[in-house]
Amino acid sequence: LRKDRNFLDAYVALGRIVSAEGVALDRNTRTWLAEAEDAYRNAEKIDGENQDVLWYWAQSYAMAGELGIAREKLQDILTFGRGKWITEALAEVDRLQKAERSAPGSKAGIKIGLKSEITRAEWAVLLVEELMLPKLLRKRGHADSPTALPADWPPDIENSWANTWIREILLVGLVGLEVYPDGNFYPDNTLTRAQYAQANQAILILLSGDQSLRHSYMGQESRFPDLRADNYAYNALALCLERGLLKIADRRTGAVNPEGPVSGADALLAIREFQNSFRVEY
């Protein structure tokens, strides 16, 4: 039995390694997924009800963009009703369902949509690839922001994989997704809910032309126990919550958690909300 368990763990490890390397090295998805499936099937032959096998198999399918099949593997875990991965499987099913509903249209969108936390660079990529914001604004007659940039591009985006997308967004000039006072963009920093809300507020104003949105919630008592009404991001967070672009962080306390992260699926759902609200056509 110990020998079988060692073999099972080895097969699971192989499936995980093949999947991680496949994504990191940008190998053909079908090729690395087939190799990972072989490893998991070998593990399954040893113990078909092992939750580690099902969990990591689901993760590999999700990494390959096979969200429906990934969800089926997670449902197999949930049928047990108990076990080490039950709580995680419930959360993962919810995340995958969000990603499926958001229906990303680009390869980058699919990859970013599966992340539990996205970076400032990844948010810029989604705004260009999924919302097509620069193209949309040009079509509506908006010129690039003359005050969006300092004299030079931020030095820390020069070697970023998202350099091109970040430059496009910087030309738009979104508050919350702009250059910091020290001249850097910090592309790899986690996007905070406050920054995300500020950028969404700026997009709402650009698409609607309603400048009053900047101060719609100013002067009122705070709706959130963890954020003062005079905070720089208060108006944007309140606006995004009311417009369905953001959800409350803690339903029990009502906390908004301005410094918390944003998931890729939630970001994509917000983009779909923009497209539906403004009947976006390209």
Predicted regions and their residues:
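Residue-level recognition of tetratricopeptide repeat
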Residues: 7, 50, 84-86
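Repeat-mediated protein-protein interaction surfaces in helical alpha-solenoids
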Residues: 36-40
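Glycine-centered, phosphate/nucleic-acid-interacting loop/turn motifs that mediate DNA/RNA or nucleotide
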Residues: 173, 244
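Residue signature of alpha-solenoid helical repeat architecture, marking inter-repeat boundaries
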Residues: 5, 10-12, 48
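Canonical tetratricopeptide repeat
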Residues: 13, 56, 89-92
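Feature responds to low-complexity, polar/acidic, surface-exposed segments characteristic
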Residues: 2, 20-23, 27-31, 42-45, ...
